[in-house]
Amino acid sequence: MELVVGRVVKSHGVTGEVVVEIRTDDPADRFAPGTRLRAKGPFDGGAEGSAVSYVIESVRQHGGRLLVRLAGVADRDAADALRGSLFVIDADDLPPIDEPDTYYDHQLVGLMVQTATGEGVGVVTEVVHTAAGELLAVKRDSDEVLVPFVRAIVTSVSLDDGIVEIDPPHGLLNLE
């Protein structure tokens, strides 16, 4: 499975730098000089699954985004060709998590959600990150519900069984 760690927003200057929107919780590691990333996007002719590999030469912060210089991208035209492309990594390349009750987002997506009594609620489609904490977006038959990812509500997660068990407060699943 591929995970998106950044998106090229636009070129910057005339020397081939690109502005990258960060989509990872560890940009210092993912975008460190010497790191190899795969870029998927409009430059590849739309071929399904194709990607071009780049080595990061330099990186610096720029207003909440990164300015990245890639080996082989030497001018504005080459940088413009990358606009809209996504930098991806393989999920298998992520380090294992040693902390209990801590998960990568992609591990939770697709899990079945049920109540403590075994009643099916739906399927996790996304983990939404907010200033107040994480929410599980759970797709139900006719709608979607956002479940706060806190111990008081999410009582257990079993990656092996593919189940997230919740103890929702009264009304959480009935909100219109």
UniProtKB/Swiss-Prot annotation:
It is found in: Cytoplasm. It comes from the Bacteria. Residues 100-172 form the PRC barrel domain. GO terms for cellular component: cytosol; ribosome. GO terms for molecular function: ribosome binding. The keyword Endoplasmic reticulum does not apply. NCBIfam families: 16S_RimM. Binds ribosomal protein uS19. This is Ribosome maturation factor RimM. The gene is rimM.
